[in-house]
Regions:
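Extracytoplasmic/periplasmic ligand-capture domains
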Residues: 1-90, 106-137, 141-174
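Flexible, glycine-rich active-site loops centered on histidine and acidic residues
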Residues: 96-103
Length: 174
């Protein structure tokens, strides 16, 4: 098994230089003669964490986020993401919905799972005072409803998930 950069692993397979290779699910729709796709169930998790504290600067570094500091905003984001759609379109159907960092582990709390509910997400954002502006971005006291999503360089799956998350949340005005 070769653990290489995703593109390098695919190139090694295409050049017949590898018998087995681990690569991104974005390549799962390609059929390569002499190879078959094998899905392996793991506890690998591609999620993100939101800052829970107000924004502050210490030693020149900004911590927290005024928008995501509100628990109802975090709840709205959680129910405003269509995980099934992401699995289908980003992961080519290879994946399971994730709700915490310990899904499928013995100590996982099933109450962490939520249903996709964009209407309830909008209601939570409105109740929290984040109103939709003419430009399609919510604001509260002049502050934009926004946060930064970071992902590892070279991880096309995390990048695609981050972009898809941003597109889904844009529909909610985030």
């Amino acid at each position: 098994v070769l653990f290489m950069e995703e593109d390098a692993a695919l190139a090694a397979v295409l050049a017949d230089q590898a018998d087995v290779a681990h690569t991104a699910v974005s390549y799962s729709d390609q059929e390569i003669e002499g190879y078959h796709l094998m899905a392996v169930h793991t506890v690998d998790n591609r999620g993100f964490n939101l800052p829970c504290s107000e924004e502050e600067t210490r030693d020149g570094i900004v911590y927290g986020n005024a928008f995501t500091a509100d628990v109802n905003v975090r709840r709205a984001i959680n129910i405003g993401i269509d995980r099934e759609e992401m699995i289908e379109h980003v992961l080519n159907g290879y994946g399971t919905e994730a709700y915490s960092v310990c899904d499928q582990m013995p100590w996982y709390n099933e109450k962490s799972a939520v249903s996709y509910d964009p209407e309830q997400a909008e209601q939570l954002l409105n109740e929290a005072g984040w109103k939709m502006a003419e430009d399609g971005i919510r604001r509260k006291d002049g502050e934009k409803a926004a946060f930064t999503l970071l992902f590892n360089n070279g991880d096309s799956v995390r990048q695609a998930l981050a972009e898809y998350t941003a597109n889904q949340l844009a529909k909610l005005g985030i």
